[in-house]
Amino acid sequence: MTRKYRIAVLPGDGIGPEVMREAYKILNILKDDFSLPLEIKEFNIGGAAIDQEGVALPKKTLLGCENSDAILFGSVGGKKWDNLPINQRPERASLLPLRKHFNLFANLRPAQLYSELKNLSPLRSNIIKNGFNILCIRELTGGIYFGKPTGRLKKNNIEYAFDTEIYYNYEINRIAHLAFQLSQTRNYKVCSIDKSNVLNSSILWREIVKKVSKHYPDVHLSHLYIDNATMQIIKDPNQFDVLLCSNLFGDIISDECAMITGSIGMLPSASLNEKKFGLYEPAGGSAPDIEGKNIANPIAQILSLSMLVRYSMNLKKIADKIDQSVISVLKKGYRTADISNNNDYLKTNEMGDVIASALISGE
């Protein structure tokens, strides 16, 4: 009997359900036209779950995710729930617990400038003439966001605050191995970002990355300090392939990479654990300002599904076909509002339709 791939679908809030409907079109094609044995189950998450079940991450949802091979996530949050205590708000009470529960230590953020969308980038045309395709790999469960002690105190009428950057060798080791392995599916280049001229945690980071690199002699390793890296990305993004970053530095640099592509509505992301179980979601948020207007760009959600197929299902050729269907519609001039220079653009459902048609026809 053929093993089924079990996918937990969590549409969430804001534009999440709208763009997820378009991802469903691709999922149905994978089932019906590509004959993939998919078992798809949908669960509540975020504000929608608060409204219907009283909590942002219901036990039923968590159990459904545990019984799945991957999670396809929409978005959570919105003004409606901003009056709740911060730890009960959709973002804090659903997405973060999911990451922790499944030990999703690696965040993958591709930032690709498609040649058809060069006009959207804030960079000069001579800099981006060849486009760029960067994969930012961010360590997600360690570093200064989770280090102890942390706090805010007052002594002798002087107020002060402090945080602690801690990295254990195994945390750096596993994220480094993943970066080198993924670079071998791309252009065999890893640039590790640190601040080893100042920080002890970065000194350890660089030492371990160098040791790990010896297992991958075919991959070229370079190092940059975070301050120089932010400048180099603006100067020549095409020089980079895989960026390997700590939690804090990856948080900064992945958003910079996203910005220079011109539209966050195009960008997917993945968070993986050591078993390649993953949570896949658009890099943007719930965008409540455009909710219900049928103008959200579904491409990031569709490309998030492509990443799920690539990394959790290990079906590279099919993932490539999904990616190519997106490129095909962009080459034909189809645009959503966020990437259009005029009022001639497709609605959310229309963009989903043309991508689905391109996938079926193999364009």
From Swiss-Prot:
It holds the Pfam family Iso_dh. This is 3-isopropylmalate dehydrogenase. Its EC number is 1.1.1.85. The record marks Y145, K195 as: Important for catalysis. InterPro entries: IsoCit/isopropylmalate_DH_CS, IsoPropMal-DH-like_dom, Isopropylmalate_DH. It is found in: Cytoplasm. It comes from Buchnera aphidicola subsp. Uroleucon aeneum. Gene3D superfamilies: Isopropylmalate Dehydrogenase (3.40.718.10). SUPFAM superfamilies: Isocitrate/Isopropylmalate dehydrogenase-like. Binds 1 Mg(2+) or Mn(2+) ion per subunit. GO terms for biological process: L-leucine biosynthetic process. The keyword NAD applies. It catalyses: (2R,3S)-3-isopropylmalate + NAD(+) = 4-methyl-2-oxopentanoate + CO2 + NADH.
